[in-house]
Amino acid sequence: MGCPAYENEITQKPFLNPYVYHPLFVHLSEKEKQKWEKLQRKIRPLVFTIEKLKKQHKPYQKEKKVLDNLYEKRAEIVKNAEEKMAVLDGLLDSMDPDSIQDTLLFTSNVQMDGCMQMLAEKKITRAKITEEISASKTDRETGLTERQEILKGFAAHSLQVVLGIKCMDEGIDITTARVAIILASSTNPREYIQRVGRVIRPAPGKQMSEIYDFIVLGDQDLPLLKNEEKRVALIAQNADNYMDVYQLFKGKGVDLNEYQQEN
């Protein structure tokens, strides 16, 4: 995967807290499919053009910049698929107060406010850590930064769920976290391994860790699952329920063992 230092987070099984991996499948709406297909129609010829320029040893930086922008727009459609919120709603309803405790919820900027409102309606105590939540501003009375106050409340169980975006990927140590809900994922191995690593690090008294991963499925014309396979294989490989996950994906035409052989 190219990130061995981060892969150790979830491949060195003797040093992991036992965990169960739960893939949660969602689909794009018809409107989202149309947007995705429209971007694909722009991406395909551009990829061809760039490959042609490379072979001719001609500059292609301008085309590459346009292509990267299209890839980013396509990823945003998948990241913010509308059905994710409905599936999250059902997941939260299925979790009792004990099982929702010690949960990290990874969202996108677009999803953050909706998630906060959903948790509030379900009377789940929560706080969000964003780039705007200062890591340096100190409270005059406690001497703690805003982030430190949130993490203190999380460790003390006065907060059940902490929500975060990319700022949760580095520099924050939350050893008490046991559950990860990955609503918005990343295609960057370093980022998604760090997110999983937040909840599978061992800690005294920590019970089985749980990872809920939202995966967008396509159809014959939208092979979206292909983009997720390596990530799923890497996260699932040391899960206590690996064979169940393997069979689940096998039924969708994906052999996760192929990726085990690569790693």
Can you annotate each of these PLM segments?
Residues 1-101:
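Interdomain helical connector at the RecA1-RecA2 junction of SF1/SF2 helicase-like NTPases
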Residues 108, 131, 185, 214-216:
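Cofactor-binding loop segments of dinucleotide-utilizing enzymes, especially the Rossmann-like FAD-
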Residues 198-228:
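Conserved segment of the helicase C-terminal RecA-like domain
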Residues 1, 16-21, 123-125, 175-179, ...:
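Short glycine-/polar-rich loops that comprise or flank the Walker A/P-loop
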Residues 102-106, 112-170:
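Conserved helicase ATPase core of P-loop NTP-dependent helicases/translocases
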Residues 222-263:
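Long, largely alpha-helical accessory region at the distal end of helicase-like NTP-driven motors
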Residues 35, 191-195, 227-231:
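Alpha-helical scaffold elements adjacent to nucleotide-binding pockets in ATP/GTP-utilizing enzyme cores
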Residues 160-186, 191-194, 208-214:
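A short beta-strand element within the Helicase C-terminal
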